[in-house]
Curated annotation (Swiss-Prot):
Gene3D superfamilies membership: 2-C-methyl-D-erythritol 2,4-cyclodiphosphate synthase
Cofactor, how bound (note): Binds 1 divalent metal cation per subunit.
Subunit structure of this chain's protein: Homotrimer.
EC number of the protein: 4.6.1.12
Gene Ontology BP terms: isopentenyl diphosphate biosynthetic process, methylerythritol 4-phosphate pathway; terpenoid biosynthetic process
Protein name: 2-C-methyl-D-erythritol 2,4-cyclodiphosphate synthase
Annotated positions binding a divalent metal cation: D8, H10, H42
Organism this protein belongs to: Ectopseudomonas mendocina (strain ymp) (Pseudomonas mendocina)
C-alpha cells in the first residue's frame, strides 16, 4: 500500500469559466495556467505520482514545454495513471478538497467525481471530492485563486 499527497494552486485571471475535475464551470474569472488550469486534476496527479515516487506533474509535463500549452488535464491524469499501473499499483481510493470562496462547487461535485473515476478506471465510490471556503480569509477567501489538496491510496495490482 502506498499513499501520496498533492497540492496545487492557480490564481484567477481573465476568463469566464474555470475547469475543475474536467467540468467546465461558469465564473467571473478564469484560472491562469500553462495547461487548462484544472487545479483539482493537477493536485490529484501529484498525489498519484508521489505515491509511486515518480516526482510531480512539473517533472512530467513542464510548463516550459510548448507541447503542454493549453493541455487537457484529463489527458495528463490518464497518462499519470498509466505510469501508476506501470509501477504495479492500482487506486484504492482518492480524496480531494477544493478550497475556494467562489464559485459554488456543490452543483458540480458529482460530475467531477464521475469524470475522475472514468479517467482513473475505478468505481465512483473510490473517488471523493469535497469543497470548503476559508470564510473569506487568505487568498482563496479574497477570491484571488483556488487551492486543492488531494490524497491517493494505492494498492498492489
Amino acid at each position: 500500500m502506498r499513499i501520496g499527497h498533492g497540492y496545487d494552486v492557480h490564481r484567477f485571471g481573465e476568463g469566464d469559466f474555470i475547469t475543475l475535475g474536467g467540468v467546465r464551470i461558469p465564473h467571473k474569472f478564469g484560472l491562469v495556467a500553462h495547461s487548462d488550469g484544472d487545479v483539482l486534476l493537477h493536485a490529484l496527479s501529484d498525489a498519484l505520482l508521489g505515491a509511486v515516487a515518480l516526482g510531480d506533474i512539473g517533472k512530467h509535463f513542464p510548463d516550459t514545454d510548448p507541447t503542454f500549452k493549453g493541455a487537457d488535464s484529463r489527458a495528463l491524469l490518464r497518462h499519470v495513471m498509466s505510469l501508476v499501473r506501470g509501477k504495479g499499483y492500482a487506486v484504492g481510493n482518492v480524496d480531494a478538497t477544493i478550497i475556494a470562496q467562489a464559485p459554488k462547487m456543490a452543483p458540480h461535485i458529482q460530475s467531477m467525481r464521475e469524470r475522475i473515476a472514468e479517467d482513473l478506471g475505478v468505481e465512483l465510490d473510490q473517488v471523493n471530492v469535497k469543497a470548503t471556503t476559508t470564510e473569506k480569509l487568505g487568498f482563496t477567501g479574497r477570491e484571488e485563486g483556488i487551492a486543492v489538496h488531494a490524497v491517493a491510496l494505492l494498492v498492489k495490482a
